[in-house]
Regions:
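Beta-strand-enriched, solvent-exposed domains that form extended recognition/catalytic surfaces
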Residues: 1-81
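Active-site-proximal alpha/beta segments of enzymes that process anionic O-linked groups
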Residues: 44, 74-78, 82-209
Length: 209
């Protein structure tokens, strides 16, 4: 809690491994021992915990976690941004490889939670503008199709990183918002499978180490 991780169980020494880096470059694991009843500040939004059971003399499975680290730059931005009661918290949720109608049929509880509990808006008129996941997501996040943007392909030796795209979160950041981006499968990432990925971390909180 409070941007820290704490060990509250005896006879269970643990190590926390933070993953430091930027953009889609290889991340550097940094391990820190976590003694009983102590806490350490989060160094990254994503980390793993490895513990040893001294009584059973066994190692427990490594557990991954996602949290929000303290970021002074973000705090300064929030402190200097004029508060507007009309501003919304905005979450864009995309599900790949499934149509809207199939989503409603196959995941009715999830659909009901999004539409009723969260009062979410379903983009009924949204259509893919090409083939593949990038053709699904690039237009809604940039307002342009991939062919209208600078080349970011791996095979293009003069290609740019996808940082050059006019992502909508850049505009939100300029207006004082805290931004974030996450994918469930970074090994097959939208921006890295056939594109060059990000050179710099694109959002305040980037959940794809």
């Amino acid at each position: 809690d409070n941007y820290t991780v704490r060990l509250i169980q005896k006879d269970l020494p643990c190590s926390v491994v933070f993953y430091l880096g930027r953009g889609d470059r290889p991340y550097r694991p940094t391990s820190i021992s976590l003694p009983y009843n102590t806490s350490i500040s989060l160094l990254s939004d994503h980390f793993t915990v490895q513990c040893n059971d001294l009584l059973k003399r066994t190692s427990l499975p490594t557990v991954p976690y996602i949290s929000i680290r303290y970021d002074e730059n973000v705090r300064q931005r929030l402190a200097t941004t004029k508060k507007n009661p009309d501003n919304f918290n905005i979450l864009i949720l995309g599900l790949d490889s499934v149509s809207r109608m199939q989503f409603e049929r196959m995941l009715p509880k999830t659909f009901a939670y999004i539409t009723k509990e969260l009062d979410g808006i379903i983009l009924k008129g949204y259509n893919i503008l090409g083939d593949g996941t990038p053709a699904q997501i690039i237009p809604i996040l940039t307002g342009m199709q991939e062919r209208e943007l600078p080349s970011t392909l791996h095979r293009d030796k003069n290609g740019s990183f996808v940082d050059v795209y006019p992502f909508i979160w850049n505009q939100y950041r300029e207006r004082g918002y805290v931004t974030g981006y996450a994918e469930d499968g970074p090994s097959m990432g939208i921006w890295t499978l056939r594109l060059r990925g990000f050179n710099r971390t694109p959002t305040d909180h980037y959940m794809t180490p």
